[in-house]
Each structure stands twice: as structure tokens, then as C-alpha cells.
UniProtKB/Swiss-Prot annotation:
A single MF term (Gene Ontology): rRNA (guanine-N7-)-methyltransferase activity
Chain's gene name: rsmG
UniProt main location, coarse: cytoplasm
Keyword S-adenosyl-L-methionine set for record: yes
Binding locations of S-adenosyl-L-methionine: G81, F86, A130, E131, R144
Function: Specifically methylates the N7 position of guanine in position 527 of 16S rRNA.
Alphabetized Gene3D superfamilies for the sequence: Vaccinia Virus protein VP39 (3.40.50.150)
HAMAP family: 16SrRNA_methyltr_G
Organism: Rhodospirillum centenum (strain ATCC 51521 / SW)
Superkingdom of origin: Bacteria
Name recorded for this polypeptide: Ribosomal RNA small subunit methyltransferase G
Lineage: Bacteria, Pseudomonadati, Pseudomonadota, Alphaproteobacteria, Rhodospirillales
């Protein structure tokens, strides 16, 4: 997938295709996703209404930039607090073979199932809280705008297989969140610039363990 820098405002489907090098079929599936998002959003407030006119950058590109950070051979991804499906459902459409979307809100879970059905995305929706949901051991766990790292890590650890990674897009609080999380967790941290948020960072975390526990 291309690493082309994202253009300025008025980012549309054709810009997304140029930036990420996706096929016409993938673009059509994302367009169907956009149509469903616009249809359902007034009733269940999936995303801020102000972001709908910039959905290709604010939501699709923001999610798609994580694809290149997945380990080679990633098969199972668990997305926590999926909401409107970002980033998990976009990553499923882009080609992750098995994605599990954890979303406790029943209405949002219904939306996710409908998008997965219409687009043919390989996604399973779990209408449960992350503390109770069950999924296969994951090669990667993702979450966007769900919680502080200190709260995310114990949730993610439930699903990660040994050697798995976490991908968390974060805003300007990333450094502070890492400092707090390291009080209770050890981890290897890789930080990448966000292509959609100049003040944000993409965190790729591996070798995650509660502080004091040996990684086996």
C-alpha cells in the first residue's frame, strides 16, 4: 500500500485511492460503507455530523493508515469499542482476513453487521463489552478514541496472542498516556506520524506485559 502523503482539504474517494493504492472494488465497498453511514447516522449518532463531509479523510484514511503497520501475515485482528467501525471495519475491507469488532451498543452493533453484510467484509460483530467478549487469539488489537492507554492495555491483553501487537492512533496526549501506562505495564513502543492528524501519533506496541511479569 502506498505511503503517499495525504493532500489538503476536500479529500475524496479518488484521493483515497491515490494515497493508498486500493482497487476499484475496494473503493466501491468503501463507498457503500459511506452511504450506510450517512443513512444510519441521524438515528444513532455514529460519528459527529461535522465529519461526514470529510469522511474519506477523517474516518477512512485515518483508519487505513494503520494497515501498513500490521505485521506481515496478520490474520486475526480484534477492534475494541468499534463504534462506527473505525478502524476495524476499514481494515477488514482492506484485506485483514478475520476481524472481530467489539461494540457493546446494540444499535451500533446492528450497523456494523449491516455494513459487513453489504460490503462482504470478513468481520464478526460481538455486541458485548470488551471485558466479557471472547475472540480467537489476535495477531493485532486496535482501538480508536476509546480510552486512555492505561485502561486500554488490560483490555487488549485479553485478546493478544503471544507476540501480538497493539495499534492505537492517539492525539497530542500520546506521550503523557505512555508515561502513565508505563507505571503498570512494560512494552516496546514504536511511534509513527499520523497522516491525517499533524498533532497525532500512531502507536505500535509489542512485548506487552503487566509490570513485574516476565514475558514468556
Amino acid at each position: 500500500m502506498s505511503n503517499t502523503r495525504l493532500p489538503a482539504p476536500s479529500f475524496r474517494a479518488t484521493d483515497f485511492q491515490a494515497a493508498f493504492g486500493v482497487s476499484r472494488e475496494t473503493l466501491d465497498r468503501l463507498a457503500a460503507y459511506e452511504a450506510l453511514l450517512r443513512k444510519w447516522n441521524p438515528a444513532i449518532n455514529l460519528v459527529a455530523r461535522s465529519t461526514l463531509d470529510d469522511v474519506w479523510e477523517r474516518h477512512f484514511a485515518d483508519s487505513a493508515q494503520l494497515f501498513a503497520l500490521l505485521p506481515e501475515g496478520t490474520r486475526v485482528l480484534v477492534d475494541l469499542g468499534s463504534g462506527a467501525g473505525f478502524p476495524g471495519l476499514v481494515l477488514a475491507i482492506l484485506g485483514v482476513p478475520e476481524v472481530h469488532l467489539i461494540e457493546s451498543d446494540g444499535r451500533k452493533a446492528a450497523f456494523l453487521r449491516e455494513v459487513a453484510r453489504v460490503t462482504g467484509a470478513p468481520a464478526t460483530v460481538h455486541a458485548q463489552r470488551a471485558e466479557q467478549a471472547e475472540a480467537p487469539p489476535a495477531d493485532a488489537v486496535s482501538a480508536r478514541a476509546l480510552a486512555d492507554l492505561s485502561a486500554l492495555l488490560p483490555l487488549a491483553a485479553r485478546f493478544l496472542r503471544p507476540g501480538g501487537i497493539c495499534l492505537f492512533p492517539k492525539g497530542r496526549t500520546a506521550a503523557d498516556e505512555l508515561t502513565r501506562a508505563r507505571d503498570s505495564w512494560t512494552m516496546r513502543v514504536e511511534e509513527f506520524p499520523s497522516r491525517t492528524d499533524p498533532s497525532g501519533a500512531l502507536l505500535r506496541l509489542s512485548e506487552i506485559a503487566p509490570r513485574g511479569m516476565q514475558i514468556g
